[in-house]
From Swiss-Prot:
Annotated protein name in UniProt: Ribosomal RNA large subunit methyltransferase M
HAMAP family: 23SrRNA_methyltr_M
Family: Belongs to the class I-like SAM-binding methyltransferase superfamily. RNA methyltransferase RlmE family. RlmM subfamily.
Species of provenance: Cronobacter sakazakii (strain ATCC BAA-894)
GO molecular function (one): S-adenosylmethionine-dependent methyltransferase activity
Key words, A-Z: Cytoplasm, Methyltransferase, rRNA processing, S-adenosyl-L-methionine, Transferase
Active site: 306
Compartment(s) of residence: Cytoplasm
Taxonomic lineage of the native organism: Bacteria, Pseudomonadati, Pseudomonadota, Gammaproteobacteria, Enterobacterales
Pfam families linked to this entry: FtsJ, RlmM_FDX, RLMM_N
Amino acid sequence: MNKVILYCRQGFEKECAAEITDKAAQQGVFGFARVKENSAYVIFECYQPDDADKLARELPFSSLIFARQMFVAGELLQDLPPEDRVTPVVGMLQGVVEKGGELRVEVADTNESKELMKFCRKFTVPLRTALRDAKILANFETPKRPVVHVFFIAPGCCYTGYSYTNNNSPFYMGIPRLKFPADAPSRSTLKLEEAFHVFIPADEWDERLANGMYAVDLGACPGGWTYQLVKRNMWVASVDNGPMAQSLMDTGQVTWLREDGFKYRPTRTNITWMVCDMVEKPAKVAALMAQWLVNGWCRETIFNLKLPMKKRYEEVSQNIASIQAQLDEHGINAQIQARQLYHDREEVTVHVRRWWAAVGGRRDER
Protein backbone atom coordinates (compact mmCIF):
# COMPACT_ATOMS: atom_id res chain seq x y z
CA MET A 1 0.00 0.00 0.00
CA ASN A 2 1.78 3.13 -1.22
CA LYS A 3 -1.01 5.72 -1.15
CA VAL A 4 -2.17 8.17 1.49
CA ILE A 5 -5.77 9.35 1.10
CA LEU A 6 -6.80 12.65 2.65
CA TYR A 7 -10.35 13.96 2.98
CA CYS A 8 -10.82 17.73 2.67
CA ARG A 9 -13.46 20.39 2.10
CA GLN A 10 -14.89 20.38 -1.42
CA GLY A 11 -13.05 22.98 -3.52
CA PHE A 12 -9.88 22.86 -1.39
CA GLU A 13 -8.24 19.84 -3.03
CA LYS A 14 -5.33 21.90 -4.43
CA GLU A 15 -4.52 23.33 -1.00
CA CYS A 16 -4.67 19.88 0.57
CA ALA A 17 -2.39 18.50 -2.17
CA ALA A 18 0.13 21.34 -1.81
CA GLU A 19 0.21 20.80 1.94
CA ILE A 20 0.71 17.01 1.91
CA THR A 21 3.43 17.32 -0.76
CA ASP A 22 5.22 19.95 1.35
CA LYS A 23 4.84 18.13 4.69
CA ALA A 24 5.79 14.73 3.21
CA ALA A 25 8.99 16.20 1.75
CA GLN A 26 9.86 17.55 5.22
CA GLN A 27 9.62 13.92 6.43
CA GLY A 28 11.90 12.76 3.59
CA VAL A 29 8.98 11.17 1.72
CA PHE A 30 8.51 11.94 -1.96
CA GLY A 31 5.65 11.26 -4.33
CA PHE A 32 2.91 13.05 -6.26
CA ALA A 33 -0.62 14.16 -5.43
CA ARG A 34 -3.57 13.21 -7.59
CA VAL A 35 -6.23 15.89 -7.53
CA LYS A 36 -9.74 15.77 -8.95
CA GLU A 37 -11.46 19.13 -8.65
CA ASN A 38 -14.40 19.30 -6.21
CA SER A 39 -13.98 15.62 -5.26
CA ALA A 40 -13.32 16.47 -1.56
CA TYR A 41 -10.33 14.11 -1.35
CA VAL A 42 -6.69 13.89 -2.45
CA ILE A 43 -4.54 10.83 -3.16
CA PHE A 44 -0.83 11.18 -2.41
CA GLU A 45 1.10 8.38 -4.10
CA CYS A 46 4.51 7.63 -2.59
CA TYR A 47 7.43 6.51 -4.77
CA GLN A 48 8.59 4.01 -2.12
CA PRO A 49 6.11 1.30 -1.00
CA ASP A 50 6.68 1.68 2.77
CA ASP A 51 6.55 5.47 2.78
CA ALA A 52 2.76 5.69 3.04
CA ASP A 53 2.88 3.82 6.35
CA LYS A 54 5.75 6.05 7.46
CA LEU A 55 3.61 9.15 6.85
CA ALA A 56 0.65 7.61 8.68
CA ARG A 57 2.88 6.97 11.69
CA GLU A 58 5.27 9.94 11.70
CA LEU A 59 3.59 12.92 10.01
CA PRO A 60 1.53 14.46 12.85
CA PHE A 61 -2.08 14.60 11.69
CA SER A 62 -2.52 17.63 13.98
CA SER A 63 0.01 19.53 11.82
CA LEU A 64 -2.23 19.33 8.72
CA ILE A 65 -4.50 22.31 8.06
CA PHE A 66 -6.65 21.25 5.12
CA ALA A 67 -7.01 17.49 5.77
CA ARG A 68 -9.99 16.12 7.70
CA GLN A 69 -8.68 12.55 7.73
CA MET A 70 -5.54 10.68 6.63
CA PHE A 71 -5.16 6.94 6.00
CA VAL A 72 -2.96 4.47 4.10
CA ALA A 73 -4.59 2.80 1.07
CA GLY A 74 -3.84 0.35 -1.73
CA GLU A 75 -5.06 0.16 -5.32
CA LEU A 76 -8.60 1.10 -6.27
CA LEU A 77 -11.05 -1.80 -6.17
CA GLN A 78 -13.32 -1.44 -9.21
CA ASP A 79 -16.48 -3.12 -10.47
CA LEU A 80 -17.31 -4.92 -7.25
CA PRO A 81 -19.84 -7.64 -8.16
CA PRO A 82 -23.31 -6.67 -6.87
CA GLU A 83 -23.93 -10.23 -5.65
CA ASP A 84 -20.77 -10.23 -3.45
CA ARG A 85 -19.04 -6.95 -2.71
CA VAL A 86 -17.66 -8.18 0.62
CA THR A 87 -15.14 -10.83 -0.55
CA PRO A 88 -12.92 -8.52 -2.70
CA VAL A 89 -12.73 -5.97 0.15
CA VAL A 90 -11.75 -8.67 2.66
CA GLY A 91 -9.15 -9.95 0.18
CA MET A 92 -7.55 -6.50 -0.18
CA LEU A 93 -7.18 -6.15 3.59
CA GLN A 94 -5.90 -9.69 4.23
CA GLY A 95 -2.36 -9.55 5.57
CA VAL A 96 -2.48 -5.73 5.79
CA VAL A 97 -4.40 -5.22 9.03
CA GLU A 98 -4.74 -7.64 11.92
CA LYS A 99 -7.40 -7.22 14.61
CA GLY A 100 -8.33 -3.64 13.76
CA GLY A 101 -10.27 -1.76 16.40
CA GLU A 102 -12.97 -0.11 14.26
CA LEU A 103 -14.47 -0.18 10.76
CA ARG A 104 -15.44 2.99 8.92
CA VAL A 105 -17.17 2.70 5.53
CA GLU A 106 -17.05 6.26 4.22
CA VAL A 107 -17.63 8.56 1.24
CA ALA A 108 -16.34 11.99 0.27
CA ASP A 109 -18.24 14.97 1.70
CA THR A 110 -20.07 16.03 -1.49
CA ASN A 111 -23.73 16.26 -2.51
CA GLU A 112 -23.13 13.57 -5.14
CA SER A 113 -22.03 11.10 -2.44
CA LYS A 114 -25.21 11.31 -0.37
CA GLU A 115 -26.85 8.40 -2.21
CA LEU A 116 -23.70 6.33 -1.70
CA MET A 117 -23.88 7.02 2.02
CA LYS A 118 -27.12 5.02 2.28
CA PHE A 119 -25.39 2.03 0.70
CA CYS A 120 -22.38 2.42 3.04
CA ARG A 121 -24.61 2.17 6.10
CA LYS A 122 -26.18 -1.07 4.84
CA PHE A 123 -22.84 -2.50 3.69
CA THR A 124 -21.09 -1.90 7.02
CA VAL A 125 -22.88 -4.68 8.93
CA PRO A 126 -22.11 -7.67 6.64
CA LEU A 127 -18.60 -6.34 5.97
CA ARG A 128 -17.86 -6.00 9.69
CA THR A 129 -18.96 -9.62 10.27
CA ALA A 130 -16.75 -10.90 7.43
CA LEU A 131 -13.73 -8.87 8.59
CA ARG A 132 -14.13 -10.26 12.12
CA ASP A 133 -14.33 -13.81 10.77
CA ALA A 134 -11.10 -13.16 8.82
CA LYS A 135 -9.41 -11.74 11.98
CA ILE A 136 -8.90 -8.41 10.18
CA LEU A 137 -11.15 -6.80 12.80
CA ALA A 138 -11.13 -7.62 16.50
CA ASN A 139 -14.36 -9.03 17.93
CA PHE A 140 -14.96 -5.77 19.80
CA GLU A 141 -14.27 -2.10 19.07
CA THR A 142 -11.14 -0.71 20.71
CA PRO A 143 -9.30 2.62 20.32
CA LYS A 144 -5.98 0.83 20.88
CA ARG A 145 -5.95 -0.86 17.45
CA PRO A 146 -5.83 0.64 13.91
CA VAL A 147 -9.00 1.87 12.18
CA VAL A 148 -9.98 0.01 8.99
CA HIS A 149 -11.18 2.40 6.26
CA VAL A 150 -13.27 1.49 3.21
CA PHE A 151 -13.72 4.61 1.09
CA PHE A 152 -16.27 4.52 -1.74
CA ILE A 153 -15.71 7.05 -4.53
CA ALA A 154 -18.47 5.65 -6.79
CA PRO A 155 -20.90 2.69 -6.75
CA GLY A 156 -18.81 -0.49 -6.82
CA CYS A 157 -15.49 1.43 -6.54
CA CYS A 158 -13.58 1.81 -3.29
CA TYR A 159 -10.18 2.20 -1.66
CA THR A 160 -9.34 0.12 1.40
CA GLY A 161 -6.75 0.85 4.06
CA TYR A 162 -6.05 1.80 7.65
CA SER A 163 -5.11 4.64 9.99
CA TYR A 164 -3.52 4.75 13.44
CA THR A 165 -5.73 5.92 16.30
CA ASN A 166 -2.95 8.04 17.82
CA ASN A 167 -2.55 9.94 14.53
CA ASN A 168 -5.93 10.32 12.83
CA SER A 169 -9.26 12.05 13.24
CA PRO A 170 -11.46 10.20 15.76
CA PHE A 171 -14.56 11.26 13.81
CA TYR A 172 -16.37 9.36 11.05
CA MET A 173 -15.39 11.02 7.72
CA GLY A 174 -13.30 13.39 9.84
CA ILE A 175 -16.42 15.38 10.75
CA PRO A 176 -17.62 15.96 14.35
CA ARG A 177 -21.41 15.63 14.54
CA LEU A 178 -22.59 18.75 16.38
CA LYS A 179 -26.14 19.93 16.90
CA PHE A 180 -26.98 23.61 16.50
CA PRO A 181 -28.28 24.89 19.88
CA ALA A 182 -31.74 26.43 19.45
CA ASP A 183 -30.90 29.36 21.75
CA ALA A 184 -27.58 30.30 20.07
CA PRO A 185 -27.55 33.74 18.37
CA SER A 186 -25.89 32.50 15.14
CA ARG A 187 -24.67 29.34 13.40
CA SER A 188 -21.07 30.53 13.81
CA THR A 189 -21.28 29.12 17.34
CA LEU A 190 -20.61 25.66 15.85
CA LYS A 191 -17.18 26.81 14.60
CA LEU A 192 -15.95 27.47 18.13
CA GLU A 193 -17.54 24.32 19.53
CA GLU A 194 -15.86 22.24 16.80
CA ALA A 195 -12.55 24.02 17.48
CA PHE A 196 -12.76 22.95 21.13
CA HIS A 197 -13.29 19.33 20.03
CA VAL A 198 -10.43 19.41 17.52
CA PHE A 199 -7.80 21.35 19.47
CA ILE A 200 -8.42 20.48 23.13
CA PRO A 201 -8.28 16.86 24.35
CA ALA A 202 -11.56 15.85 26.00
CA ASP A 203 -9.85 14.98 29.29
CA GLU A 204 -8.50 18.57 29.55
CA TRP A 205 -11.81 20.40 29.06
CA ASP A 206 -12.56 20.68 32.78
CA GLU A 207 -9.18 22.30 33.38
CA ARG A 208 -8.85 24.51 30.29
CA LEU A 209 -12.51 25.46 29.72
CA ALA A 210 -13.36 25.89 33.38
CA ASN A 211 -16.11 27.67 35.29
CA GLY A 212 -15.30 31.23 36.31
CA MET A 213 -12.55 31.89 33.75
CA TYR A 214 -12.31 35.33 32.15
CA ALA A 215 -12.56 35.51 28.35
CA VAL A 216 -12.63 38.15 25.62
CA ASP A 217 -14.51 37.85 22.30
CA LEU A 218 -13.25 40.31 19.67
CA GLY A 219 -15.79 41.14 16.95
CA ALA A 220 -18.45 39.38 19.00
CA CYS A 221 -21.77 40.56 17.48
CA PRO A 222 -24.33 38.95 17.65
CA GLY A 223 -22.64 36.50 20.04
CA GLY A 224 -22.23 33.08 18.43
CA TRP A 225 -18.76 32.57 19.92
CA THR A 226 -19.62 34.34 23.19
CA TYR A 227 -22.45 31.80 23.56
CA GLN A 228 -19.96 28.89 23.77
CA LEU A 229 -17.96 30.67 26.49
CA VAL A 230 -21.08 31.57 28.48
CA LYS A 231 -22.26 27.95 28.16
CA ARG A 232 -19.08 26.94 29.97
CA ASN A 233 -19.81 29.47 32.74
CA MET A 234 -17.05 31.95 31.86
CA TRP A 235 -17.19 35.73 32.36
CA VAL A 236 -16.98 37.28 28.90
CA ALA A 237 -16.04 40.75 27.66
CA SER A 238 -17.68 40.94 24.21
CA VAL A 239 -16.07 43.63 22.07
CA ASP A 240 -18.02 44.93 19.05
CA ASN A 241 -19.74 48.09 17.84
CA GLY A 242 -22.71 45.92 16.86
CA PRO A 243 -25.27 44.80 19.48
CA MET A 244 -25.16 41.50 21.35
CA ALA A 245 -28.09 39.08 21.56
CA GLN A 246 -30.31 40.00 24.52
CA SER A 247 -30.44 36.35 25.63
CA LEU A 248 -26.68 36.51 26.31
CA MET A 249 -26.87 39.85 28.12
CA ASP A 250 -29.61 38.42 30.36
CA THR A 251 -27.22 35.78 31.73
CA GLY A 252 -25.28 38.45 33.63
CA GLN A 253 -22.02 36.84 32.46
CA VAL A 254 -21.44 39.17 29.48
CA THR A 255 -20.06 42.71 29.45
CA TRP A 256 -20.67 44.40 26.10
CA LEU A 257 -17.85 46.80 25.19
CA ARG A 258 -18.85 49.01 22.26
CA GLU A 259 -15.41 49.26 20.67
CA ASP A 260 -13.41 48.25 17.61
CA GLY A 261 -11.81 44.85 18.25
CA PHE A 262 -8.54 46.03 16.72
CA LYS A 263 -8.30 49.03 19.07
CA TYR A 264 -9.48 47.39 22.29
CA ARG A 265 -6.86 46.89 25.02
CA PRO A 266 -7.74 44.72 28.03
CA THR A 267 -7.49 46.10 31.56
CA ARG A 268 -7.57 42.71 33.29
CA THR A 269 -4.41 40.64 33.78
CA ASN A 270 -6.14 37.29 34.34
CA ILE A 271 -7.74 36.61 30.95
CA THR A 272 -7.51 32.94 30.01
CA TRP A 273 -9.25 32.90 26.61
CA MET A 274 -9.42 35.35 23.73
CA VAL A 275 -11.48 34.35 20.69
CA CYS A 276 -11.88 36.25 17.44
CA ASP A 277 -13.93 35.78 14.26
CA MET A 278 -13.61 39.10 12.42
CA VAL A 279 -13.95 39.60 8.67
CA GLU A 280 -10.61 41.22 7.91
CA LYS A 281 -7.41 40.55 5.95
CA PRO A 282 -5.68 37.51 7.49
CA ALA A 283 -2.33 39.31 7.89
CA LYS A 284 -4.01 42.05 9.95
CA VAL A 285 -5.77 39.51 12.20
CA ALA A 286 -2.53 37.51 12.62
CA ALA A 287 -0.69 40.68 13.69
CA LEU A 288 -3.37 41.44 16.30
CA MET A 289 -3.26 37.88 17.66
CA ALA A 290 0.54 38.04 17.93
CA GLN A 291 0.23 41.31 19.87
CA TRP A 292 -2.15 39.69 22.39
CA LEU A 293 0.13 36.70 22.86
CA VAL A 294 3.39 38.65 23.09
CA ASN A 295 1.91 41.05 25.66
CA GLY A 296 0.56 38.19 27.74
CA TRP A 297 -3.02 39.49 27.49
CA CYS A 298 -4.38 35.92 27.24
CA ARG A 299 -3.19 32.36 27.75
CA GLU A 300 -5.03 30.68 24.89
CA THR A 301 -6.66 31.97 21.75
CA ILE A 302 -8.81 30.59 18.95
CA PHE A 303 -9.28 32.80 15.90
CA ASN A 304 -10.27 32.62 12.25
CA LEU A 305 -8.19 33.68 9.26
CA LYS A 306 -10.30 34.50 6.19
CA LEU A 307 -8.70 33.04 3.06
CA PRO A 308 -7.91 34.88 -0.19
CA MET A 309 -9.08 33.51 -3.54
CA LYS A 310 -5.63 32.29 -4.60
CA LYS A 311 -2.53 30.84 -2.90
CA ARG A 312 -4.54 29.98 0.19
CA TYR A 313 -2.09 27.44 1.63
CA GLU A 314 0.80 29.87 1.15
CA GLU A 315 -1.13 32.72 2.81
CA VAL A 316 -2.09 30.69 5.89
CA SER A 317 1.45 29.28 6.23
CA GLN A 318 2.86 32.81 6.03
CA ASN A 319 0.41 34.15 8.66
CA ILE A 320 1.22 31.32 11.09
CA ALA A 321 4.96 31.72 10.48
CA SER A 322 4.72 35.46 11.26
CA ILE A 323 3.02 34.71 14.61
CA GLN A 324 5.64 32.06 15.40
CA ALA A 325 8.47 34.47 14.52
CA GLN A 326 7.14 37.13 16.92
CA LEU A 327 6.70 34.59 19.71
CA ASP A 328 10.26 33.32 19.14
CA GLU A 329 11.62 36.87 19.12
CA HIS A 330 10.13 37.48 22.58
CA GLY A 331 11.17 34.09 23.97
CA ILE A 332 7.61 32.80 24.31
CA ASN A 333 7.06 29.07 24.07
CA ALA A 334 3.72 28.25 22.45
CA GLN A 335 1.81 25.51 20.68
CA ILE A 336 0.16 26.51 17.38
CA GLN A 337 -2.42 24.36 15.58
CA ALA A 338 -4.58 25.22 12.58
CA ARG A 339 -7.39 23.42 10.77
CA GLN A 340 -10.03 24.16 8.19
CA LEU A 341 -12.97 22.93 10.23
CA TYR A 342 -16.12 21.34 8.86
CA HIS A 343 -18.11 24.44 9.90
CA ASP A 344 -15.55 26.82 8.35
CA ARG A 345 -16.08 28.12 4.83
CA GLU A 346 -13.40 30.22 3.10
CA GLU A 347 -11.39 30.36 6.31
CA VAL A 348 -9.06 28.49 8.63
CA THR A 349 -9.30 28.28 12.44
CA VAL A 350 -6.10 28.66 14.47
CA HIS A 351 -5.44 27.75 18.11
CA VAL A 352 -2.44 29.08 20.05
CA ARG A 353 -1.59 28.12 23.61
CA ARG A 354 1.13 29.99 25.47
CA TRP A 355 3.16 27.75 27.76
CA TRP A 356 4.56 30.62 29.81
CA ALA A 357 3.96 34.34 30.08
CA ALA A 358 5.91 37.16 28.48
CA VAL A 359 5.05 39.53 31.32
CA GLY A 360 7.58 39.59 34.15
CA GLY A 361 6.42 38.26 37.50
CA ARG A 362 3.45 36.39 36.05
CA ARG A 363 3.17 32.63 35.72
CA ASP A 364 0.81 30.49 33.70
CA GLU A 365 -0.85 27.37 35.02
CA ARG A 366 1.88 25.25 33.40
